[in-house]
C-alpha cells in the first residue's frame, strides 16, 4: 500500500511514497509543470475559462454547469466536453505536462451531471452517433481518456484517472463507465473529500465499494486542509486518523492526502503522532499499513 501527498503547491513532504502537484486545479489557475512529481490536471472543471468564455460552459434544461446553479452540487464551473477548441488545448496541455512530470493524474474528465450537455453541438453529435443518450456520453468520456492516455504514454509516464465518489450511478450521471475506462487507466483515484469525517463508516463503505467494482488499482483521496480554509472548517486530526485507518483496511491500493501546501500536511503529521488516545484506538482497527505510516512519521519529528 502506498501513501501520497496531493498539494496545490509544487512541494514534496517527507514521509510519503509519492507526491502529486495540482498543476491545474478546477479553479483554472495554471502552474508550471513540475518534474519528479505526478502532475494533476483538472480537465473540464475550469472556473477561469468559464468566466472568460461563458459560451463554453455546459448547459442543461435546468441551467448551466456553474457553481451558482443550486439545482446541482457543483463545487466549480464545468465546460462542455465537446468544444473542439478547448478539447484540443487541454490534450496538448496534458502532453506538455507529461514531458516533464513523473506521471499524470486527471480529474474532472466527465460530463457535469445528469442532463448535461444539451448544447446544439452535443445534441447534434449525439444524433449523428446513432447511440442512446447514455451510451453516447460514455463514448465521449472514454474517447477523451483514450486520447489523453496516448499523449501521456508517448512519454512513457504512468496515467491515473480521477473519478467521482458515486460507485452506482457514475455512468448515468457523468458518462463514466468504469469497465470502459479500465483499459486506459494505470490506476484510479477516488476523492472522498469532506470537511468532516465524523461518520467514518460511510467513507469506508465508499472505499470498499470502489475497490470491489474497479478493475485497476484504487487510490482514495482524503481532505486535510484546502486553500482558504480556517482551522474550524477542516476535519479534526482524530477524524482524519480514524477515516484513514478505516479506508486502509478495505484493501485499496493507496491513500492520498490533499492539502493546500507542504506545511499544512506537516502540521497534520505532527499532530497525528501526538494524538495518543486516537492512535491507541485505531491500533485495533486492523489497518497495519496505515499504522506503519504513522511509525514512519514518528521517526521524522
What are the roles of these predicted feature ranges?
Residues 192-199, 221-301:
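Substrate-binding cleft of secreted/luminal carbohydrate-active enzymes
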Residues 13-14, 158-198, 232:
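Substrate-binding cleft/loops of secretory-pathway carbohydrate-active enzymes
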Amino acid at each position: 500500500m502506498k501513501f501520497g501527498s496531493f498539494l496545490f503547491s509544487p512541494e514534496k513532504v517527507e514521509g510519503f511514497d509519492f507526491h502529486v502537484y495540482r498543476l491545474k486545479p478546477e479553479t483554472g489557475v495554471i502552474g508550471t509543470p513540475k518534474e519528479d512529481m505526478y502532475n494533476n490536471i483538472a480537465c473540464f472543471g475550469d472556473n477561469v475559462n468559464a468566466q472568460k468564455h461563458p459560451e463554453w460552459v455546459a448547459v442543461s434544461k435546468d441551467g448551466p454547469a456553474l457553481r451558482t446553479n443550486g439545482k446541482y452540487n457543483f463545487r466549480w464551473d464545468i465546460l462542455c466536453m465537446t468544444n473542439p477548441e478547448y478539447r484540443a488545448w487541454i490534450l496538448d496541455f496534458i502532453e506538455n505536462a507529461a514531458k516533464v512530470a513523473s506521471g499524470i493524474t486527471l480529474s474532472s474528465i466527465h460530463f457535469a451531471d445528469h442532463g448535461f450537455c444539451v448544447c446544439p453541438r452535443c445534441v447534434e453529435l449525439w444524433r449523428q452517433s446513432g447511440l442512446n443518450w447514455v451510451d453516447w456520453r460514455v463514448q465521449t468520456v472514454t474517447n477523451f481518456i483514450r486520447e489523453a492516455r496516448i499523449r501521456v504514454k508517448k512519454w512513457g509516464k504512468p496515467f491515473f484517472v480521477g473519478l467521482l465518489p458515486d460507485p452506482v450511478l457514475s455512468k448515468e450521471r457523468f458518462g463514466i463507465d468504469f469497465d470502459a475506462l479500465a483499459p486506459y487507466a494505470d490506476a484510479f483515484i477516488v476523492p472522498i473529500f469532506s470537511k468532516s469525517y465524523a461518520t467514518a463508516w460511510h467513507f469506508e463503505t465508499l472505499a470498499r465499494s470502489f475497490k470491489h467494482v474497479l478493475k485497476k488499482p484504487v487510490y482514495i483521496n482524503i481532505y486535510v486542509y484546502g486553500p482558504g480554509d480556517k482551522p474550524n472548517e477542516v476535519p479534526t486530526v482524530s477524524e482524519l486518523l480514524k477515516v484513514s485507518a478505516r479506508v486502509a483496511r478495505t484493501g485499496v491500493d493507496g491513500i492520498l492526502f490533499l492539502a493546500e501546501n507542504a506545511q499544512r500536511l506537516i502540521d497534520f503529521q505532527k499532530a497525528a503522532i501526538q494524538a495518543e488516545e486516537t492512535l491507541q484506538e485505531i491500533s485495533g482497527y486492523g489497518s497495519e499499513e496505515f499504522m506503519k505510516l504513522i511509525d514512519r512519521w514518528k521517526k521524522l519529528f
